[in-house]
Each structure stands twice: as C-alpha cells, then as structure tokens.
A protein has these predicted regions:
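Mature catalytic domains of secreted/periplasmic carbohydrate-active enzymes
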Residues: 20-437
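Bacterial Sec-dependent N-terminal signal peptides
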Residues: 1-21
Length: 438
C-alpha cells in the first residue's frame, strides 16, 4: 500500500469555528501591535472578488502587437510613419482559437505601447490605425480582438503605456493626464467588459527625457467607475510585477505582502524604510511583517515572452522557447502562487506564427496529461488544518506519482508557511518533497 502524508505549518492556529474578522485587500496595523498580533491580522487579509477571480485564471496571454511589429524594434520612438502598419491577413480569431485550445483564460493586447501608436481609432491622436492603410484607415484591432474573445469565451484585457513618446503633451503634467485618461476612457467604454488593465512601469525619463507626474488617483478612479470588475496591474493596485521577465516566481511568494502599490502616495518612503522593492526576495516573511505598518493583498503576475523579444521578429522564428523551458516556467509561476502571463507576439501578417502555435499546443498537452488523472483518493477535498497537523491520503494501487498539487483556499487568507510530503512505501515513510507558500 502506498500512502501520502501532508504536514502543514500555518500562520496562525486560530482556525477553529469562532467568527473571524477579515480584511479585504489592505490592513493597517494598530500602533504598538506585537509581532504575533500582526501575524494574526496578516492571516486574515483576503483578496477582493476581482483579485480572487484573477488569481483563479492562472494562465493568461500577452499580445505585443503594434507599430514595432513592422519596424523591428522593441521600443519605438513615436516618430514612426503609420503607413507602415498594414497587417493584411490580420485574424484575431486565429489568435484566440489558439489561446483557447492552449488553455489560456484571457488575452491582453498592447493597445498602445511606448511609441504612442494606438491600435484603435482614437480621437486623441493621429498616431493610430486610422492613419494607416490597413482597411483604408477603418480598422480597429482592439475591437476585432474583443469580438474574438467573446466568440471563443476568453476574457479580455488592455495594456496602455503611460509613457508616450509621441504625445506632444507628455511631460506637461495635467495636460497629459487628461490626454491619457481620455484614451483610457475610450478603451473602457467602447469595448465591452475589460478584466485587466495593465500599466507598464517602463519609461525613459531622465536627463534627456521628459518628467511626467501621473495622476494615479484619477486614473484608478476612472477604472473603478467604468470597469469595476477589472483588476489593475503593475502600476495599478491589484496585481504586482513579479520582479523579473524570466518567467520565474519566488519559491516563497506571498500575496499578503508589505509591498505597497507603487501608485500609492508614500510608497517610496515605505520601500526605503523596509528595504524592499518589487524585485526583493522577501516580501512577506514574519520578520518583514513585524516591521511593517500595513499589509496589502497584492498578488504576483509573471510576464515572460515565448521568444527572446516581446514583439515579433522574423529572425527569432527558430528561437521559440523549448517545451522543457516552458514547463519549467509554468511550475515556477503558476506553481509558485503567481499568474503566468505568457507573451505570444503576432507577426507582420497579423497572425500567430506557426512555430508559436505548435509550441503552446505541446505545452497544453503536457499540462493536461500531467493533471488530468488525480491518483489520490479524495484528494480534492478541502482540509482545514491547524499548526503541525498531518493528513494521510491513499494513492490508487499500481500508479506512479511524480507531481504533487496543493492549493489553498485564499478566501480565508494566505496562511500556509510550509508543508512537507512523505510517501509510505515498502514499510517505511520517505520524505519526497517540501515547500513554503502555496
């Protein structure tokens, strides 16, 4: 007989039947709170309904597509001629079919990258598809993707770069904020339900650049008003950047974190006081919680490209990540308490390249084969554990197991700090694995 035993270490032992107070998205510790009091409150910090729905998606797709697709650049300078944008075979349904078959839950399009070129016929600038020969200036990539997502049942998100190298008003404070919010408003009112709004933190500000103070309060309020079910990512306050673009989450990845959203006033002071930033290894340990005055439910998103570049480059057609590499990324992202945002850039034709489509099919087949057959009896039942508890599960006879999946009910907060897995075989228990956060 083979059995599996799971031992869990939890943030607090107060998991009985008594009523508990939960803190949604943010908790401020009272003055003089002890470490144990902070840990107890941390264990009752929970996601908003929007954050919960987002975390349950697990696997989403980035679509870097725009004027850079035709210039061969990664960062455009805003001086591009819109006449070069002409994806004569553009087929958003081809994109979305591939994503649906690949197990993706959402597609996020770069509606405007740093070059300022807009993939929809905006009223704010001439640097858009309306000035291109594609469909005689009557095309709308955002709308076509929106319709394809509706048809095939994928959620829809938009990337809108705050940094704009084309807009003349960039760097003029309120003038640009008004311009940016007008673009945002167009995207959030003309394209149905939007599930994620992605704000890149990249910019070229410095000695030779323009300094723009973004009105994040007004920007986030606009989203809450127009798309209340959407999460805001990176420079938003619902979803944080994992801290690298290599596809690797932390082995200990906290959703309940001392990292204040960067768009909040005073965030720089908090980072300095705690000695942390988005790339820090530790964002939620007991030691860090003891020093913090606030905690935020701020889960991690791992963004990585299937190719060396974010935009399509023909010379990279044979440099698509291997299946083994993508499997490792999957385990190091989804398997490390993060949502995986895998970039698959459409090519100049307006199609997903055959090599990319082939590879994502291989990945989804691997994932399905790995997790389709649950070999543990009653393994999908919820177990409410206390500190140090163990639980035994029977594994079906004559089966081999090489992957162990454990999940946590985060509607009650993030409480698991550590777990071990042992297997009973040949008359003895054998340690086969261990981990920290789930």
């Amino acid at each position: 007989m083979r059995k599996t035993i799971l031992t869990a270490a939890l943030l607090c032992a107060f998991l009985g039947t008594q009523a508990q107070e939960y803190y949604e998205k943010h908790v401020a510790f009272p003055a003089g709170a002890t470490t144990e009091q902070k840990i107890d409150m941390a264990s009752r910090l929970v996601p908003t309904p929007q954050q919960l729905a987002w975390q349950q998606m697990e696997f989403t797709c980035f679509l870097h597509f725009g004027i850079n697709t035709f210039t061969g650049r990664e960062w455009g300078d805003g001086k591009e001629d819109p006449a070069i944008f002409n994806p004569t075979e553009l087929d958003c349904e081809q994109w979305v079919r591939a994503l649906k078959e690949g197990g993706f839950k959402m597609a996020i399009i770069t509606a405007k990258h740093h070059d300022g070129f807009c993939l929809w016929p905006t009223r704010t600038t001439k640097h858009s598809v309306a000035s291109s020969p594609w469909k005689n200036g009557k095309g709308d990539v955002v709308q076509e993707l929106r319709k394809a997502c509706d048809k095939y049942g994928l959620k829809f998100g938009v990337y809108l770069s705050p940094w704009d190298r084309n807009a003349e008003c960039y760097g003029q404070g309120e003038a640009y904020n008004k311009f940016f919010i007008e673009q945002l408003t167009e995207l959030l009112t003309n394209y149905g339900e939007v599930h994620e709004v992605w704000f890149d933190g990249a910019n070229g500000e410095g000695p030779n650049g323009k300094k723009q103070e973004y009105d994040w309060d007004a920007i986030l309020k606009t989203i809450r008003r127009l798309q209340p079910k959407a999460v805001t990512a990176i420079m938003g306050d619902d979803v944080r950047w994992v801290g690298n673009e290599g596809g690797l989450g932390r082995t200990t990845e906290w959703s309940a974190t001392a990292l204040m959203p960067n768009s909040y006033p005073g965030s720089d002071e908090v980072y300095k006081r705690l000695g942390i930033n988005a790339m820090s290894k530790d964002l939620g340990s007991r030691e860090l919680v003891s020093k913090a005055s606030d905690l935020f439910w701020y889960p991690s998103e791992v963004d990585v490209s299937i190719r060396p570049g974010w935009f399509y480059h023909a010379e990279q057609d044979n440099q698509v990540r291997s299946l083994a590499n993508l499997v490792n990324i999957y385990y190091r992202s989804v398997g490390c308490n993060s949502v995986l945002l895998l970039n698959i850039p459409p090519d100049k034709r307006g199609l997903m390249h055959e090599n990319d489509v082939k590879r994502i099919k291989e990945l989804t087949e691997y994932i399905k084969k790995t997790f389709a057959d649950n070999k543990v009896e009653k393994g999908n039942r919820i177990w409410t554990a206390k500190v140090g508890d163990t639980k035994e599960y029977k594994v079906r006879k004559n089966t081999l197991v090489n992957t162990f999946l454990i999940q946590e009910d985060i509607t009650k907060g993030q409480r698991v700090e550590g777990f071990t897995v042992e297997v009973f075989a040949n008359g003895a228990w054998h340690h086969v694995g261990e981990g920290t956060t789930v």
